[in-house]
A protein has these predicted regions:
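C-terminal substrate-binding subdomain of Rossmann-fold SDR/epimerase-dehydratase oxidoreductases
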Residues: 66-192
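Active-site helix-initiating loop/hinge in glycosyltransferases
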Residues: 50, 54, 83-86
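Catalytic helix-loop patch of NAD(P)-dependent Rossmann-fold dehydrogenases
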Residues: 1-42, 53-55
Length: 192
C-alpha cells in the first residue's frame, strides 16, 4: 500500500471489518446512482482516538496497561507506522461535511497525516506521558500469539492524504498527538 493513501487509490480490504466498510461505501454510491437527488459524503476516518475510548484500540490499550504498571504489548516488531487523529478533530470534520454542499457526493480522508509514528515510539511516548519512564518498557509479541491479529494481514504503514478535505472543508489537525494523549490520560477513564 502506498502512503499517504489518497481517496482515489484502489482499496484492498484484508479483513471482514475493512471489506464491510468498503461495501457500505459502494452501497451508498449505488443508492445515489439510483436516486439522483440523494447526496452523500463518505468520510474515511484514519485511526481516531480520544477520551472514553475502550481499551480495545492501541492508544487507550497502551494507556490502560501503563496506568496499571503493566507494559504495553506490541504485536509484531513495533515498526508498524500509523498516524492518529484526535476525536475532536474527527468530529469537527464530520459536522463540517454535514453542512457543506462542497462535500456532496465526495469521499474524503479524515486523519492526521503530519505525525506518523511507529508503535515502539508510541508506546514510549505513552510511558513518558504517564510518568513511568525508565520503570516500564514495551513488551514485544512478535508472533501475534493470543491476539485477534495476524502477521499476514498486518499493514506496516498506514496514513492518509487529507489535501482534498483541507480544500473542501478547510480541514486541519488542531490537536497534536502528544496533546491528545495527555487529554486521554487526564480523563483517567478507559473502559475495558
Amino acid at each position: 500500500i502506498k502512503n499517504p493513501i489518497e481517496e482515489t487509490d484502489i482499496t484492498q480490504g484484508k479483513t471482514l471489518y475493512a471489506v464491510s466498510k468498503l461495501a457500505g461505501e459502494e452501497l451508498v454510491k449505488a443508492y445515489q446512482y439510483e436516486y439522483k437527488s440523494f447526496n452523500f459524503s463518505i468520510l474515511r476516518y484514519f485511526n481516531t482516538y480520544g477520551p472514553f475510548q475502550v481499551a480495545q484500540f492501541v492508544i487507550p490499550k497502551f494507556i490502560f496497561r501503563v496506568q496499571r504498571n503493566l507494559p504495553p504489548i506490541i504485536n509484531g516488531d513495533g515498526s508498524q507506522e500509523r498516524s492518529y487523529n484526535f476525536s475532536q478533530d474527527t468530529a469537527r470534520a464530520t459536522v463540517d461535511a454535514l453542512f457543506s454542499s462542497k462535500a456532496n457526493n465526495k469521499t474524503l480522508n479524515i486523519g492526521n497525516s503530519s505525525e506518523p509514528i511507529n508503535l515502539i515510539d508510541l508506546a514510549n511516548l505513552i510511558i513518558k506521558k504517564c510518568g513511568k519512564e525508565n520503570k516500564i518498557f514495551p513488551s514485544m509479541n512478535k508472533n501475534f500469539s493470543n491476539t485477534d491479529r495476524e502477521d499476514s494481514r498486518e499493514i506496516n504503514y498506514r496514513y492518509c492524504d487529507t489535501s482534498l478535505a483541507e480544500r473542501i472543508l478547510d480541514y486541519k489537525v488542531r490537536t497534536k498527538l502528544e496533546k491528545g494523549i495527555e487529554k486521554v490520560i487526564e480523563t483517567n477513564i478507559i473502559p475495558e
